């Protein structure tokens, strides 16, 4: 398991604001020796970002997210079903509020197009995911950990709407709707 979430948590506690933690091949300027649970966030309070951090065998760039007046500005968000409809507009609103947004959708091409429309790298990141499949969701979580080290907000918007009465659906159609 990656140290990225713990590194992100240390900087969040130290600086009082979210950061993005991404793998780096650059030379580290800060090295954590020993368990991260023993690192005092107070030792990082004066750290100027961006910084390259070595934690165990991993090296990360820790960079600031945008800051502003809104409470969610600078947060890292995930919107499932984010390629179209309500999800796309929620993603747009989060970007407009200053969030870095993962646009997650079963339609990978749609997610990529929406992420590019919202500003692309540094603002939005597409992820192809089937939220009804555990392995797909696990792969999404690994991608999020790799790219930013974690999340602050989750909008679980993905869903399936079927025409007709729920009373007339067969069991597999009903199960798929409720699994999502």
For each feature predicted by the language model, list its residue ranges.
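Glycine-rich flexible loops
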Residues: 1-77
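Canonical Rossmann dinucleotide-binding motif of NAD(H)/NADP(H)-dependent dehydrogenases/reductases
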Residues: 70-102
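Conserved catalytic-site loops of classical short-chain dehydrogenases/reductases
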Residues: 76, 152-153, 175
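Rossmann-fold scaffold of SDR-type NAD(P)-dependent oxidoreductases
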Residues: 80, 151-158
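Conserved glycine-rich Rossmann-like NAD(P)H-binding loop of the short-chain dehydrogenase/reductase
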Residues: 99-113
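Conserved residues in the N-terminal Rossmann fold of short-chain dehydrogenase/reductase
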Residues: 103, 128, 179
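The beta1-alpha1 cofactor-binding region of Rossmann-like NAD(H)/NADP(H)-dependent oxidoreductases
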Residues: 108-109, 128-139, 171
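Substrate-binding pocket helix/loop in short-chain dehydrogenase/reductase
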Residues: 165-166, 170-175
């Amino acid at each position: 398991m990656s140290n990225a979430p713990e590194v992100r948590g240390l900087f969040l506690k130290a600086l009082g604001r979210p950061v993005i933690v991404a793998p780096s091949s650059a030379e580290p300027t800060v090295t954590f020796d020993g368990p991260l649970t023993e690192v005092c966030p107070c030792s990082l309070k004066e750290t100027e970002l961006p910084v390259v951090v070595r934690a165990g065998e991993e090296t990360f760039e820790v960079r600031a997210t945008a800051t502003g007046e809104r409470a969610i500005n600078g947060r890292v968000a995930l919107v499932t079903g984010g390629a179209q409809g309500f999800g796309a507009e929620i993603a747009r609103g989060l970007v407009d509020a200053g969030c870095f947004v993962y646009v997650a959708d079963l339609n990978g091409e749609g997610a990529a197009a929406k992420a590019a429309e919202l500003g692309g790298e540094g603002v939005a990141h597409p992820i192809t995911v089937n939220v009804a499949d555990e392995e797909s969701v696990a792969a999404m979580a690994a991608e999020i950990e790799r790219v930013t080290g974690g999340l602050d907000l989750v909008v679980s918007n993905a869903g399936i709407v079927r025409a007709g009465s729920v009373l007339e659906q067969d069991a597999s159609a009903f199960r798929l709707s409720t699994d999502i």
